Structure formats: C-alpha cells, structure tokens
C-alpha cells in the first residue's frame, strides 16, 4: 500500500479506554491538539503514551495564533516541541488564522488577505520552525467575513505557502463551507491549491445554519458534496493521508469506522492515483 494511502482519526479523551484495549486496523494514525494533551498525567497520560507507541501521531494546534498581532508565545512553542520530542511526533500543523490580540479569543479569526499579512505570517513561520526544529504545516481555514481583503483567499493561501516555503494541510470541508458562505466554486478553489505543497488532508462534517450559511462544527456526518470534493481532490492532487475530524456529537466507533472505510475505498478506487502520489 502506498505510504500516502493512509487514514487517520482525531483522538478524543473518551476514546482512550477503547483504543488502548484494541485499536482498529483501519486507523493508520491519530491526530491530537497538543494543547489538550500536554499537561495530562495519571491514567490519561499513561494511556496516551501507550497509544503513541502503537500508532503514528500528528499534532494539529489550536492556539499558536500564527497571524496574530501579538508577539509569538515563545514558551508555548517550546512546550509544543518538548511534547513532540517526548512522544516522537514529527508532524505539526496549525490554522492559517489568529486567536489572540488584546487577550485570547477562544475562536479562530481570519487574517486579512493582504500582502502585509503574508509577510507577517512568513516571519512568524520561520520563528516557529527554528524553535520546533520541524516544518510548520498550515491549514486553510473556514471563515465568515474577510476584513480588509486586498486579494482572494486562494491568492493569500498560495502567497503564504510560497513565501514561507511551507506545506499545506488541505481541509476539504473548509473549502466546501467557504464556497457556500462566500459563493465561489469549490472545485475551482481546490484546483488552485499547489499539489507539491500538500502534506495531508482533513475531512469533516458541518452544520447548516441556513441555506447560504454553513458552520464548520466537526459535529456531524460528512455529506455527499464533501465526499465528492474529496474524490476530486484525489483525482487532481493524488492520494494523500486523510484525517477524519469528529469533535462533537461523537457516534459509536463503528459509525466512525464506516466513514474511515469510505475514505480508504476512495483512496484505492483508482490505482493510478496511488502511483501518482507515491
């Protein structure tokens, strides 16, 4: 099997008992938000260590605030490095957004799509990478307003990736959510992403607030148009490791495995896709 044809699951604490007893073979890797696990001790800490010795892990951060106006929290980045070193984790991704300004905002805010913002992010990416001694992977995010935009979303994302020389966590559901909320063509946006910079993918469900407003919740099953966009992604960019996010309304593992199996099926549907990404 191609190293790219892997499927992962976002790990939640309530899954620890079950997965420490038996980890399904269909789950090739796990992803965690390090902020939620760095200070764990006791039973949870022991269980987490057990799983990291059994399966590969990725880290997907929540509060680096790579585009924020405040100085980077250097100690926080050092703590992330120590956590990753302890558990032998090499992959770290973060949202191309910010969550701090005057205080910490417990949400991910959009960065203005400007050249000034591009250069601001690029400088901070280099700082983070120097401390982590690892590449920083950036994720395209869902957003509900674009303040002060001087370029389009895909122009901004591409500019940051190019100037920072970093890789992309391509979130397929975020593309769909933004395409509905901001009235653009999801397939066209998907095709504008640089294949050579894609590290891995996210896919998730969302909540339809209204006909023209979708909220990225990670709390529902994946819908048909998002599945179709994932297939298109494999057809355009080749197969990449793909992570199922489910943060709320978590169903029984059997239902999560149904979606994981569906991703595996798409990854293996066209053999030429595997050879292209190998």
Curated annotation (Swiss-Prot):
It holds the Pfam family MbnB_TglH_ChrH. HAMAP family: UPF0276. Belongs to the UPF0276 family. This is UPF0276 protein Ssed_2857. It comes from Shewanella sediminis (strain HAW-EB3).
């Amino acid at each position: 099997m191609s190293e790219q044809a892997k499927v992962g699951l976002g790990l939640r604490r309530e899954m620890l008992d079950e997965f420490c007893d038996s980890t399904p073979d269909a789950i090739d890797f796990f992803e965690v938000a390090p902020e939620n696990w760095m200070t764990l001790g006791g039973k949870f800490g022991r269980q987490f260590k057990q799983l990291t010795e059994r399966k590969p892990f990725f880290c997907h951060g929540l509060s680096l605030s790579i585009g924020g106006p405040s100085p980077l929290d250097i100690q926080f980045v050092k703590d992330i490095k120590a956590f990753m070193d302890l558990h032998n984790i090499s992959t770290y991704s973060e949202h191309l957004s910010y969550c701090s300004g005057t205080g910490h905002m417990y949400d991910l805010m959009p960065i203005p799509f400007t050249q000034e913002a591009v250069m601001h992010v690029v400088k901070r990416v280099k700082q983070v990478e120097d401390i982590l001694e690892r590449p920083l992977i950036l994720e395209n995010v869902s957003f509900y307003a674009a303040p002060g935009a001087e370029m389009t979303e895909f122009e901004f994302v591409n500019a940051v990736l190019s100037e920072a020389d970093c890789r992309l966590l391509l979130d397929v559901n975020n593309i769909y959510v933004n395409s509905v909320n901001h009235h653009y063509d999801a397939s066209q946006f998907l095709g504008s992403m640089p294949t050579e910079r894609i590290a891995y993918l996210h896919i998730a469900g969302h909540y339809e607030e209204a006909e023209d407003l979708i909220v990225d919740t990670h709390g529902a099953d994946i819908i048909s148009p998002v599945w179709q966009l994932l297939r298109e992604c494999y057809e355009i960019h080749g197969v990449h490791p793909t992570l199922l996010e489910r943060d709320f309304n978590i169903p029984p593992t059997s239902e999560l495995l149904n979606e994981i199996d569906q991703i595996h099926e798409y990854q293996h549907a066209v053999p030429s896709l595997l050879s292209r990404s190998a």
